[in-house]
């Protein structure tokens, strides 16, 4: 039994998980999870939240660096494919078992302020990561934190029933991934995330890669660096 346990430990020691947006709400929790189960975790975060919203994730990054000896942080802009390749993907190669892509420009209003920046961060940078994964660690799992905003305003067309304490979907339990993402208004943020979402799916089907999109919405928590344009629940509580 000890032999098998040792072999398992050796596998984990050589296994790396890449987390983009590692100082953010979801990214930092992902770092904690994979660090706690024994993976070497590489976090990528250049604190663009400071540029977007004048708030910072640096304090979260500092906590992670001090707490986890198996966590390494890289201050790299995910739009810079060459830096990602040289510093991380080329060095680690097939030892990368998982990429959890959480980094994003996450605000509807901010996207309209700088559409090019929004699309480069959300869509083009996702393509960078997909290509590097395909080139250096094609069997790795690629997990993309998408958004329910890919559905645009299509949910507004659903039949809603007013109950005593809440609104509920009439005649159906929930909304699944079969809902259309087409013929609707999204916001520029929703469109850039939709482009990335579709690309992640396509790399899975076209190149037979292990990809998945998680379409969350209005996520918050104790480590959310809330700002007026993003993370509003956290912002008003603080």
Where are these regions (language model features)?
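N-terminal Rossmann-like NAD(P)+-binding domain of SDR-like oxidoreductases, especially those catalyzing
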Residues: 4-219, 224
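Glycine-rich phosphate/pyrophosphate-binding beta-alpha loops
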Residues: 231
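Alpha-helical substrate-binding/gating segment
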Residues: 234-238
């Amino acid at each position: 039994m000890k032999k098998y346990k040792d072999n398992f430990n050796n596998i984990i020691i050589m296994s790396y998980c890449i987390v983009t947006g590692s100082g953010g709400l979801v990214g930092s929790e992902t770092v904690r999870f994979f660090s706690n189960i024994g993976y070497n975790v590489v976090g990528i975060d250049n604190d663009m939240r400071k540029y977007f919203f004048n708030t910072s994730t640096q304090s979260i990054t500092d906590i992670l660096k001090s707490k986890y000896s198996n966590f390494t942080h890289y201050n790299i802009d995910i739009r810079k494919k060459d830096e990602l390749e040289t510093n991380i993907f080329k060095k680690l190669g097939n030892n990368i078992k998982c990429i959890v892509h959480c980094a994003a420009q996450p605000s509807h209003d901010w996207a309209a302020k700088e559409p090019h920046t929004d699309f480069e961060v959300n869509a083009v940078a996702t393509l960078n990561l997909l290509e590097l994964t395909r080139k250096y660690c094609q069997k790795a799992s690629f997990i993309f934190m998408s958004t329910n905003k890919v559905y645009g305003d299509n949910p507004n067309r659903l039949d809603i029933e007013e109950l005593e304490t809440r609104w509920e979907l009439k005649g159906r339990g929930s909304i699944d991934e079969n809902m259309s993402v087409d013929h609707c208004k999204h916001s520029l943020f929703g469109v850039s995330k939709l482009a990335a979402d579709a690309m992640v799916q396509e790399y899975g089907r076209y190149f037979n890669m292990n990809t998945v999109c998680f379409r969350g919405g209005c996520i918050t928590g104790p480590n959310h660096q809330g700002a007026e344009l993003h993370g509003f629940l956290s912002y008003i509580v603080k």
